[in-house]
């Protein structure tokens, strides 16, 4: 029987967080990371820095829009669409196959993140799920940025460094996947609601970027 989803999530993140501590790192055998995975780790670190800077600027610019983590209504646009935490479950926590993400892999990952064709099923599933997360956020951010650029006040728009960082990590993952459709709206944009949603998405994406960076660190070290 698998542990409860909430307990599993906490356990996974705690384990991944421990990998950051030098005391544990000294006790681990020194692996030889693949150049491809190391490249993806660099991209994930760049992405984390970019989203952190973008969020900080947004909180300063939109200080009257309730843009702090304590004030916003947290939302996960990937909920019920991807299962990154389960897909990236560390081998140390894998007791049986029923604890893995149940959906079959319909994606073929052939990007530079994979060291060879012998990459495990779990690694392929993990990287594919990360790719899907990034793709969904990329579509949302591009649609939102298009609205913000229409704002006569020109108060805020997305940092190109963050959009570039997303694109570079997507290219490194290079998953053959169905393109996420971008719904175009004919309605007059509500710039106030758009800026509120921007805050919500930036907070959610930073949390996801932290998770992705830890997953990449784990895969690079394993």
Curated annotation (Swiss-Prot):
Which residues are sugar-modified?
42, 96, 110, 183
Leader peptide range in chain numbering: 1-25
UniProt record, GO biological process: immune response; interleukin-12-mediated signaling pathway
Q: Name one GO molecular function term.
A: cytokine activity
Query: In which domain of life is the source organism classified?
Result: Eukaryota
Question: Which cysteines does the record link by disulfide bonds?
Answer: 40-113, 67-199, 88-126
- The entry's keywords: Cytokine, Disulfide bond, Glycoprotein, Growth factor, Secreted, Signal
Q: Tell where it localizes.
A: Secreted
Assembly mode:
Heterodimer with IL12B; disulfide-linked. This heterodimer is known as interleukin IL-12. Heterodimer with EBI3/IL27B; not disulfide-linked. This heterodimer is known as interleukin IL-35. Interacts with NBR1; this interaction promotes IL-12 secretion.
Role noted for this protein: Heterodimerizes with IL12B to form the IL-12 cytokine or with EBI3/IL27B to form the IL-35 cytokine. IL-12 is primarily produced by professional antigen-presenting cells (APCs) such as B-cells and dendritic cells (DCs) as well as macrophages and granulocytes and regulates T-cell and natural killer-cell responses, induces the production of interferon-gamma (IFN-gamma), favors the differentiation of T-helper 1 (Th1) cells and is an important link between innate resistance and adaptive immunity.
| Record's protein name | Interleukin-12 subunit alpha
Give the organism, scientific name: Felis catus
């Amino acid at each position: 029987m698998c542990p409860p989803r909430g307990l599993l999530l906490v356990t996974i993140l705690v384990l991944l967080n421990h990998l950051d501590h030098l005391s544990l790192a000294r006790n681990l055998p020194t692996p030889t990371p693949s150049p491809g995975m190391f490249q993806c780790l660099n991209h994930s670190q760049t992405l984390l820095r970019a989203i952190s800077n973008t969020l900080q600027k947004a909180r300063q610019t939109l200080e009257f829009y309730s843009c702090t983590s304590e004030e916003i209504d947290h939302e996960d646009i990937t909920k019920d669409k991807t299962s990154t935490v389960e897909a990236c479950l560390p081998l140390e926590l894998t007791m049986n196959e029923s604890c893995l993400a149940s959906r079959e892999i319909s994606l073929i990952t052939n990007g530079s993140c994979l060291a060879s064709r012998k990459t495990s099923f779990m690694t392929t599933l993990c990287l594919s799920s990360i790719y899907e997360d990034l793709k969904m956020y990329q579509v949302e951010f591009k649609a939102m940025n298009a609205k913000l650029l229409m704002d006569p006040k020109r108060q805020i728009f997305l940092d190109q460094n963050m959009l570039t960082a997303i694109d570079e990590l997507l290219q490194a993952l290079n998953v053959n996947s169905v393109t996420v459709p971008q719904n175009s709206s004919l309605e007059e944009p509500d710039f106030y609601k758009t800026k509120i949603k921007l805050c919500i998405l930036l907070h959610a994406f930073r949390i996801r970027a932290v998770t992705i960076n830890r997953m990449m660190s784990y895969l690079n070290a394993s």
